[in-house]
C-alpha cells in the first residue's frame, strides 16, 4: 500500500560545514555594517593576529541591511548600494589582515533580510545568481566561504549565529544555548558575552558561549541596552580538545 502515498516535498538540509581540528579560530560576530565599531573590530583583529589564528569565523550579522528591513528607514540612511560597498570594504580589510587564514561567514538574521526583501517585493528575481549575497559581497573572489542556513562544526564545538535557536535571550543566555544545543557551542546574536560550563553523565565537559558584538553600542532603535563589545579566540587541538577565550572589550 506504500505506493498509494503522495509525493513528499520534504528535503533534508545538508548545509552544515565540518572543518578539521588542530586550528586556532578568531570568532567575530554582529558587526552590523555600516553601523560597525571600527575600534572594536580593530581590537578583535589585533588579538587574532597576536594569537596567530589560522581561521576566522564571521558569526553572522556582518551586514545590518537596515535599508531593506521591514522597519522605517531613518532620515539620511545610506542606500542599499552604499551598505554593500561598505560591507565589501570590511571583508577586504579582514582578508588583508588574515591573508593565509581560512575565513567562513555564517548567515545571520540580518543577512536573511535580503532574501526576505526579494521574495516579498520581486519574487521573480529570487533565483538570479547576481542577487545572492555571496555574489554581492564578492565572497568567492576574497576566498570567504559562505555558510547559508547551517552550522560550522570543529571538534566538539559548534558555531552558530544564534537566531536559529529561539528562546535563548534574556537571563543566562549561554545556559539556554546549552539546553537547546545539548553540546558545546558558540553563538552571537545577543550582543552580550557570557559563558556556561557543565558536564554530561560521562563526565565530559560541555561549554557554551555567547560572544559580544562589534557594532554600534547605542543604536537609535535601542540606545539604552546592556550590550558589550567582544569576540572570542578558540583553539581546537588535534585530539579535539577546545579552549575558548571569550573576551569582552572594555
Question: Each predicted region: which residue ranges?
Answer:
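Short, well-ordered, mixed-charge alpha-helical segments that flank or form enzyme active sites
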Residues: 66, 112-116, 154, 166-168, ...
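A generic local structural motif
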Residues: 12-14, 42-45, 89-92, 145-151, ...
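Active-site-proximal loop/helix segment associated with metal-binding centers of metalloenzymes
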Residues: 120-158, 162, 169-172, 210-213
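Short hydrophobic beta-strand that contains or immediately precedes a catalytic carboxylate
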Residues: 27-29, 186-187
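Beta-strand-turn-beta hairpins that frame and shape the catalytic cleft
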Residues: 16-26, 151-158, 239
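Acidic, histidine-bearing metal-coordination/catalytic regions of metal-dependent phosphoesterases
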Residues: 1-28, 34
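Conserved beta-sheet core of the metallophosphoesterase superfamily
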Residues: 157-247
Amino acid at each position: 500500500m506504500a505506493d498509494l502515498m503522495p509525493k513528499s516535498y520534504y528535503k533534508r538540509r545538508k548545509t552544515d560545514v565540518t572543518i578539521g581540528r588542530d586550528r586556532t579560530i578568531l570568532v567575530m560576530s554582529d558587526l552590523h555594517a555600516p553601523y560597525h565599531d571600527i575600534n572594536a573590530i580593530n581590537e578583535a583583529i589585533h588579538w587574532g593576529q597576536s594569537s596567530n589564528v589560522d581561521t576566522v569565523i564571521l558569526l553572522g550579522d556582518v551586514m545590518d541591511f537596515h535599508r531593506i528591513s521591514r522597519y522605517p528607514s531613518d532620515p539620511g540612511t545610506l542606500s542599499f548600494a552604499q551598505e554593500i560597498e561598505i560591507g565589501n570594504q570590511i571583508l577586504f580589510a579582514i582578508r588583508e589582515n588574515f591573508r593565509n587564514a581560512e575565513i567562513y561567514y555564517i548567515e545571520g538574521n540580518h543577512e536573511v533580510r535580503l532574501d526576505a526583501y526579494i521574495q516579498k517585493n520581486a519574487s521573480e528575481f529570487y533565483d538570479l545568481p547576481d542577487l545572492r549575497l555571496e555574489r554581492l559581497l564578492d565572497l568567492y573572489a576574497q576566498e570567504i566561504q559562505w555558510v547559508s542556513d547551517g552550522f560550522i562544526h570543529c571538534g566538539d564545538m559548534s558555531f552558530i549565529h544564534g537566531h536559529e535557536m529561539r528562546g535563548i535571550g534574556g537571563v543566562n543566555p549561554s545556559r539556554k544555548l546549552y539546553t537547546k544545543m545539548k553540546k558545546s557551542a558558540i553563538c552571537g546574536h545577543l550582543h552580550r558575552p557570557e559563558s556556561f560550563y557543565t558536564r554530561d553523565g560521562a563526565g565530559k565537559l560541555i561549554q557554551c558561549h555567547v560572544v559580544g558584538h562589534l557594532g554600534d553600542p547605542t543604536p537609535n532603535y535601542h540606545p539604552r541596552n546592556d550590550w558589550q563589545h567582544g569576540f572570542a579566540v578558540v583553539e581546537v587541538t588535534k585530539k579535539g580538545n577546545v579552549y575558548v577565550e571569550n573576551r569582552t572589550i572594555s
